[in-house]
C-alpha cells in the first residue's frame, strides 16, 4: 500500500464548495461527498485532519461592507456563517463514523468547543477531525488567514487549498482559455504577481512560517487522497523552487 506524504494537514474549504451548483446555501450531497473523501484518508492512512471552512455561500463580509454596512459587523456575520457550515460538515463526518470536534474562535459553548490549541492537537492525536470555525475571531481577517494561522499553531505539514480549478494559473482559467497553469510557485512570486491564491496576509504568514500550500481541484473525486499520497496534481506553493 502506498504511504502518505503528509501526516497532519489543514484542509481549507471555501463556503462555495459546500453550495454545489446552486452557488449559495448548503448542498447535503456535496457536503457528504467531501466528508467521504476526508473519512477515506483517515480510515486508510490515519491522517490527522483539521478543516477550515469559509462562509461565502451564506454571507460575505466584504460584500456587506461594500454596500455600506459597518465592516466589523459584516465580518462577524461572516464568522457566524462559517459556524453553520462547520456544523453541517461535522454532522456528515460523524454519520461516517469519524469523531469530529468543532472549535470556534468566538465562544458559543452550547454548540461547539472554544478554540484551545493544546486541546485541538490532542483531538488530532486521537484521530478526531477538528473543524476550526468563526475565523480568527477578529474582523478584517479572512478564513484563508485562519487556515495559515491554525496550520502554524498546530504544526501542520501542509495546507490543502480546495478550489474549483486544478491549480494556480497566470489568469482566470474560467475566463481565459489560454491561461497557463503553474506546477510550482514560490510565495514571493504569488505576492509579487498578485496571483490571488490567498490574500496577502495569509500568503505572508505561510511564507514566514515555511508552510507549503497545495492548490487542487476538489470537484474531482479522490483528489484529497491523491494529494496526501504526493501525486503531482494541482500547484504546490512554498519556499524556493527545487
Swiss-Prot record:
It comes from Carboxydothermus hydrogenoformans (strain ATCC BAA-161 / DSM 6008 / Z-2901). Its main location: cytoplasm. GO terms for cellular component: cytoplasm. Residues 20-25 are annotated as: Involved in allosteric activation by GTP. Homohexamer. UMP binds at residues 55, 75, 136-143. The keyword Signal does not apply. GO terms for biological process: 'de novo' CTP biosynthetic process; UDP biosynthetic process. Pathway: Pyrimidine metabolism; CTP biosynthesis via de novo pathway; UDP from UMP (UMPK route): step 1/1. Allosterically activated by GTP. Inhibited by UTP. This is Uridylate kinase. CDD domains: AAK_UMPK-PyrH-Ec (cd04254).
